[in-house]
Structures are given as structure tokens and as C-alpha cells.
């Protein structure tokens, strides 16, 4: 059963913020090959706290899935981009190079429903993909009330706190 993620301590996020304030994010990026078996692409993520290694492990596992499932993860719509969370003044995890958005055409996002008071949750991302990301320390935007099913961000401290 899918559950929503709660809050937890933020040592990882504090480290990301410190690096971003110093303007050092770009110097800490690493290019990895995303889903090479399925004709994926090169993406850039941070090396801080092993985000690059975690995403590489995710890529290797998803690359072993059948094409009809892996296609939900191709192409990557974005990783590193210095920006804010839509509608806020908070930096997105994309600004730290610690988030990935998957295939937009296979995703659902609450804002796409217009101005509904209570958006109806929708999802097309296979749970097999979600489980692989979570196994490697990523949280899924599909678990949020204001859902964003294409979005995964590296927040291992939240995964660990949920398991306790």
C-alpha cells in the first residue's frame, strides 16, 4: 500500500542549502547515463551525499525492467535546474541536483487539473519504478497531497524515518 511521507530531520537538506548558497552546485555535478539499455540519455546530478551513485543504481535496476514498464522513465524531463518549487519561494531539490522528473507524457501533476479545491489523485507511473527509487533513498512526489508523479528527490532521511 502506498503511504504519504511525513516530516523528519533535515541534515541532508541543510548540506544542500549550504552548498547552494556558496554557488558550488555546478562544481559538484556528475553526468550519468540513464537507462542505456533502453536508449536513455545523459543526466546531471550532484555527487553530494552519494546522489549520483544512488541514481545510477536506480538506473541499473529500471534498465532491467521490460520496455513496457521502463518507458515510463524515458525520457528524463529534468534533473539539475536552479529553480523554485512552483508557487513558492522555496528552492526545488532540482536546484541542488538532487531530483529527477521522469517522462512528462506518462505523468500526472495536480496543477494540471486546474483550480479544483481538492485535486483528484491520478497516477500512471508503475509501482515497480516507485519501489526501485524508494529502495535507493528517493521519495516520490506521487505520495504528496499536491501530487507530482513524475518527481523523485533524494531524501534518504525521510525514507529512514518512515521505516521506523
Where are these regions (language model features)?
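Cell-envelope/glycan interface and biosynthesis
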Residues: 1-144, 153
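Basic/polar, cationic surfaces and motifs that engage anionic cell-wall
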Residues: 147-164
Amino acid at each position: 500500500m502506498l503511504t504519504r511521507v511525513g516530516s523528519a530531520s533535515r541534515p541532508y537538506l541543510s548540506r544542500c542549502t549550504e552548498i547552494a548558497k556558496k554557488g558550488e552546485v555546478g562544481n559538484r555535478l556528475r553526468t550519468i547515463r540513464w537507462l542505456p539499455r533502453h536508449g536513455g540519455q545523459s543526466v546531471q546530478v550532484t555527487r553530494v551525499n552519494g546522489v549520483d551513485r544512488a541514481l545510477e543504481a536506480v538506473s541499473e535496476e529500471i534498465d532491467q525492467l521490460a520496455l513496457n514498464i521502463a518507458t515510463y522513465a524515458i525520457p528524463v524531463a529534468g534533473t539539475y535546474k536552479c529553480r523554485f518549487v512552483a508557487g513558492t519561494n522555496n528552492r526545488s531539490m532540482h536546484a541542488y541536483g538532487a531530483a529527477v522528473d521522469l517522462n512528462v507524457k506518462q505523468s500526472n501533476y495536480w496543477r494540471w487539473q486546474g483550480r479544483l479545491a481538492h485535486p483528484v489523485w491520478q497516477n500512471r507511473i508503475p509501482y515497480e519504478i516507485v519501489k526501485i527509487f524508494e529502495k535507493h533513498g528517493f521519495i516520490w512526489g506521487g505520495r504528496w497531497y499536491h501530487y507530482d508523479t513524475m518527481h523523485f528527490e533524494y531524501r534518504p532521511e525521510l525514507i529512514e524515518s518512515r521505516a521506523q
